[in-house]
């Protein structure tokens, strides 16, 4: 599906990002496994290569413009260009449900700089390279938290949805499409680390399909949105949530 294509996946050292990176490689893409966790990214890239795919790893802080530019320069230097970007990097400390009125501002700013601003920083770093190749596609990671509650994790994802729609307007003339996936609760190590068991149980009760999702449940939507099959789709947010939104 993606032979001769080049994809950057941020936050790809584990969980959902790892699943995206591995799936893209299986479909023939050359993958840049990018993460602030350099050792984790290296391990994922090594596994992709061992499985017969093509990948490199690049350390990146998505909130830092110089770091994002270095990531993109490395990708272009090795593979010659960029076709796809998956803005998946995130930090999850906000799942402790602090109120906006009480969360420490320094933590709030750091949280938003990664979960919201990082989408814009990485998109700005990559779009000119996509335009040089005649277009491209971007997938942002949102969340059903944008619709369901208003702590600052959800607020960051509301912002991601807004960025997705505004950037679709700005990038369309360059034949660059940008969409977002809004997962419901996904069973990953990060989720298990920050989410109390009782809260997980309560979340599952809001899902008509009666289970948490897995990273693999999201892969098909990501591949579709990057592919030519989605060539007339941009600026959209797709809930992949086991029906959580319709019950909540």
Please identify what each model-predicted range represents.
Residues 38-39, 59-71, 105, 216-217:
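The beta1-alpha1 cofactor-binding region of Rossmann-like NAD(H)/NADP(H)-dependent oxidoreductases
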Residues 128, 169-173, 231:
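Alpha-helical segment proximal to the catalytic Tyr-Lys
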């Amino acid at each position: 599906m993606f032979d001769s294509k080049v994809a950057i996946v941020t936050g790809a050292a584990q969980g959902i990002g790892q699943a995206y990176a591995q799936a893209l490689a299986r479909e023939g893409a050359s993958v840049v496994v990018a993460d602030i966790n350099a050792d984790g990214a290296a391990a994922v890239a090594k596994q992709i290569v061992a499985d017969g795919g093509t990948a490199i790893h690049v350390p990146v802080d998505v909130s830092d413009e110089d770091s994002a530019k270095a990531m993109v320069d490395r990708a272009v230097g090795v593979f010659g260009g960029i076709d796809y970007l998956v803005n998946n990097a995130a930090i999850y400390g906000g799942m402790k449900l602090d109120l906006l009125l009480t969360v420490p501002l320094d933590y709030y700013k750091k949280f938003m700089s990664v979960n919201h601003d990082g989408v814009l920083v990485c998109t700005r770093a990559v779009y000119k390279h996509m335009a040089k190749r005649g277009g491209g596609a971007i997938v942002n990671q949102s969340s059903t938290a944008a619709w369901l509650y208003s702590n600052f994790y959800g607020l960051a994802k509301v912002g991601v949805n807004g960025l997705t729609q505004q950037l679709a307007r700005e990038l369309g003339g360059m034949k660059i499409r940008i969409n977002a996936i809004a997962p419901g609760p996904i069973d990953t190590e990060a989720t298990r680390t920050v989410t109390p068991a009782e809260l997980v149980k309560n979340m599952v009760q809001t899902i008509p399909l009666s289970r948490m999702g897995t990273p693999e449940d999201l892969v098909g939507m990501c591949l579709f949105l990057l592919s030519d099959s989605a060539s007339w789709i941009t600026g959209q947010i797709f809930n992949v949530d086991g029906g959580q939104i319709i019950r909540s």
